[in-house]
Swiss-Prot record:
Mg(2+) binds at S104, D243, D245, D247. GO terms for biological process: carbohydrate metabolic process; peptidoglycan biosynthetic process; UDP-N-acetylglucosamine biosynthetic process. SUPFAM superfamilies: Phosphoglucomutase, C-terminal domain, Phosphoglucomutase, first 3 domains. The active site is at S104 (phosphoserine intermediate). Belongs to the phosphohexose mutase family. Binds 1 Mg(2+) ion per subunit. It catalyses: alpha-D-glucosamine 1-phosphate = D-glucosamine 6-phosphate. Catalyzes the conversion of glucosamine-6-phosphate to glucosamine-1-phosphate. This is Phosphoglucosamine mutase. Pfam families: PGM_PMM_I, PGM_PMM_II, PGM_PMM_III, PGM_PMM_IV. Activated by phosphorylation. It comes from Corynebacterium jeikeium (strain K411). Keywords: Isomerase, Magnesium, Metal-binding, Phosphoprotein.
């Protein structure tokens, strides 16, 4: 068995790579590993399990839940719900673990499984390694009689508990703000529009009718052009786009311009510093964040700490350094006072609260930073592990960095979830970024 866990749990084509038997084994192994790390004190251990609405979700939820129950864990099934809600409910219910069945922004045929430890935090790499090892040595039998775990339906008030929680994060009513929210026909479809309405916004919800098959189908945060058009059509103050599991948020201003995760973080960092809420005046971002954001933060007296890609690594740095804000260009934003993972709904609420507080349009708030032109090319490869050390790639990177000097940067890295190698170039003008990225991508493709 090859390595299962990527940067965001286990992910793959449902019923091909990610099968029901595999989900059952994962559930059983995770139950054994995570429960062994918690002081359950003789009580029955519990796990919160949620999913997005794609067609394979019910199958995988049933299989994973059966695996957990086979090891004596009571499963609290919270139904279709955002990933950050599962993280919150894991803590709110006092559960020993949480699990989200979702492939996030991936197409409908894919699915994934991501785990949360007690308290709602994503697992560390060493714990994931232990789960994989445990899968290879699972016993044939498990607890019997009353010691077998139960699968309990806890979906009736799960969403309401989450909405009540995120609603406490803002102090400014959103009255008068008209927002179009693209729910990607995913887990945000009920949660995000309702959260924004409860806060006072005038909400136009689009792509909010999941039917098991239409999640991420030409909509949501990976198809932002759909939202750009809708914002102009509805004459809205802004638009917010979520992905399939609602852990990310991208925005569009009233003029139809995209406001990405870097810009959202810059807006929130300046706001939190102004309000005395930005611990150590420091923001956590990843190596993929735009150089323009880092320059803007420096100009505003805010330090930027960098991590590798993945909101789990952003969170790890937030915890290790006792910081309050971090995230990714893709729209995963973590506000550590209120969340343990990226939360698209919370991000949208907080962004609109800043608009309400200042009375400024999103376009003006976003001008806090100048986005350096960036080109990202995803190159399909046969073996991600050999690219970075290939002599041709090393030489091409050195030449590109020499050409750019201090006016840009180059970053090559493997995808954590797909057989791709990502080539990213930032430069002073779009043409230069495209030209250099194209050359690098061609070299990578030849390896």
């Amino acid at each position: 068995m090859g390595k299962l866990f990527g940067t965001d749990g286990v992910r793959g084509l449902a019923n091909k790579k990610l099968t029901a038997p595999l989900a059952m084994k994962l559930g059983a192994a995770a139950a054994r590993v995570l429960v062994s790390k918690e002081e359950v004190g003789g009580r029955r251990p519990t796990a919160v399990v949620g999913r997005d609405p794609r067609v394979s979700g019910e199958m995988l939820t049933a299989a994973l839940s059966a695996g957990m129950a086979s090891q004596g864990v009571d499963v609290l099934d919270v139904g279709v719900i955002p990933t950050p809600a599962v993280a919150f409910l894991t803590d709110d219910f006092g559960a020993d673990m949480g699990v989200m069945i979702s492939a996030s922004h991936n197409p409908m045929p894919d699915n994934g499984i991501k785990f949360f430890a007690a308290g709602g935090r994503k697992l560390q790499d060493d714990v994931e390694d232990e789960i994989e090892a445990t899968m290879l040595e699972l016993p044939e039998t498990g607890p019997t009689g009353a010691a077998i775990g139960r699968i309990l339906d806890e979906s009736s008030d799960a969403l309401e508990r989450y909405l009540a929680h995120v609603g406490t994060a803002i102090n400014h009513p959103l009255d008068g703000i008209r927002v179009v929210v693209d729910c990607a026909n995913g887990a945000a479809s009920t949660a995000a529009p309702e959260a924004y309405r409860q806060a006072g916004a005038d909400v136009v919800a689009i792509h909010s009718r999941p039917n098991s098959f239409n999640i991420n189908d030409g909509v949501g945060s990976t198809h932002i052009e759909v939202l750009q058009k809708a914002v102009l059509e509805h004459q809205a103050d802004l638009g917010l786009a979520h992905d399939g599991d609602a852990d990310r948020c991208l925005a569009v201003d009233s003029e139809g311009n995209v406001v990405d995760g870097d810009q959202i973080m810059a807006i929130l960092a300046v706001a939190m510093k102004e309000n005395g809420e930005l611990k150590q005046n420091t923001l956590v971002a990843t190596v993929m964040s735009n150089l323009g954001m880092k320059l803007a933060m420096r100009a505003n007296g805010i330090k930027v700490l960098e991590t590798q890609v993945g909101d789990r690594y952003v969170l790890a740095e937030l915890l290790a350094s006792d910081l309050s804000l971090g995230g990714e260009q893709s729209g995963h934003v973590i506000i550590s006072e209120h969340a343990t993972t990226g939360d698209g709904t919370l991000t949208g609420l907080t962004l609109m609260a800043r608009m309400a507080q200042t009375g400024k349009p999103l376009s003006e708030l976003a001008s806090v930073m100048t986005v350096l032109p960036q080109t990202l090319i995803n190159v399909p490869v046969a073996d991600k592990s050999v690219i970075a050390d290939d002599e041709r790639v090393v030489e091409a990177i050195a030449k590109a960095e020499e050409d750019l000097g201090d006016a840009g940067r180059v970053l090559l890295r493997p995808s954590g979830t797909e057989e791709l190698f990502r080539v990213m170039v930032e430069a002073a003008d779009p043409g230069t970024a495209r030209r250099i990225a194209g050359k690098l991508a061609a070299v990578v493709a030849e390896v």
